[in-house]
From Swiss-Prot:
Disulfide-bonded cysteines: none
Keyword terms: Ribonucleoprotein, Ribosomal protein
Keyword Ribosomal protein recorded: yes
Any Gene Ontology biological process: translation
This protein's GO CC annotations: cytoplasm; ribonucleoprotein complex; ribosome
UniProt family annotation: Belongs to the bacterial ribosomal protein bL36 family.
Stated name of the protein: Large ribosomal subunit protein bL36
Species whose genome carries this gene: Albidiferax ferrireducens (strain ATCC BAA-621 / DSM 15236 / T118) (Rhodoferax ferrireducens)
Tagged with keyword Membrane: no
InterPro entries: Ribosomal_bL36, Ribosomal_bL36_sp
NCBIfam families with a match to the protein in the record: rpmJ_bact (TIGR01022)
Length: 37
């Protein structure tokens, strides 16, 4: 899980979603998991 100020899609499987006001990236590759904050 990377915590960064700006979350970006890394590959085509990445999806940017909003969960409880937190922007997250979910992906089939666990290394691509990110959250904003």
């Amino acid at each position: 899980m990377k915590v960064s100020a700006s979350v970006k899609k890394i590959c085509r499987n990445c999806k940017v979603i909003r969960r409880k006001g937190v922007v997250r990236v979910i992906c089939t590759d666990p290394r691509h998991k990110q959250r904003q904050g």
